[in-house]
Amino acid sequence: MGVDTESARPSMLVLARESRAMTQADVAEAMTKALDGEGVVSQGYVSKAESGRLAVFGDRLALYAQALRYTPHLLCFDGDAEGAGVGLIHHRKKASLATTSLRTVHAQLNLVRLQLRNLLQAVEVRPAVLFERIEVDDRETAEDAAQTLRARWDLPPGPIESVVGAIESAGGLVIRRPLAGRELDAVSQWPEGENPIFIVNALAPADRQRFTLSHELGHVAMHVVPNGLQEQQADQFAAEFLLPARDIESDLRTHIDLDRLYELKKVWRVSMATLLRRAQTLGAVSGWRHRQLTIELSTLGYRTAEPQTFPPEKPALIPALIRHLQQERQLAVADLACLAGLHEDEFIDFFLAEAGTP
């Protein structure tokens, strides 16, 4: 079906605009600029298009897509384009993150979900989902949930070699890309009947990415309905998932100082600050000692930038699916970009650049 017969879905017009952090006035201005003096598009037109009060097709669809820097096909995507009904969106963010920035990231996540859905349909074999919902209550704690998931996924005792690898082996789809500067660590979603999706901020340090992914994993496993304790529970889940009490206690028995935390960081592949918090939680250091070492970390500038002892973990599942489409289905990058509703250069940047896939 070509541009002449396709018609944009109003919800996709909103989603595409928000993913670009544009206002309706911005879209109208971009469309007017693209007309190169041959007409003017008003903000009112964009508002009517987004509300479904007028149809967008043909040349006007192509113009709209040009302004939003997507393909016309993306604006016609079928399916749920908004968060309602497709699964609770979780995110790990700083309080300073603006609401508009969060809306942009949520829109980007929903677009990624639709793009991956199209790519997975082309593969024809969706990765098996080994995730499960684990209800946390007075009897089942977040730590219990982490132990349950480690056992279900057959993760050996001790440090997890790759959090990304563990999630992907269970059918989770992981993407690394810059998100809202350093104000947002990750965003995740587990839509009903689909694979869980995790987008982690590529700008974050490697140690923080591992904890963040584990935190998001806790969310998708435990939190179908939001609650006031969910951030605390996700942190507790992540701590036990990455640093199981029964496995790390022996490492915390010796005198804890910055040198010891640095050595343990190499083994457990989490930040020194995370190890220090875990040591206090498990009673290996007192509250006074925790405060003292926190001050030392801050004095050295480690609260914002610790020495990195290992590289970031790179996702492999999505690049492997794309390679399958290239090799087995003989699809060129241009074909894949079309499925995702992206121009070729942006498709490469979003899905292939980090993996080095041609």
Language-model segments: residues:
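Active-site hotspot residues in diverse enzymes, especially metal/ion-binding acidic/histidine motifs
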Residues: 1-358
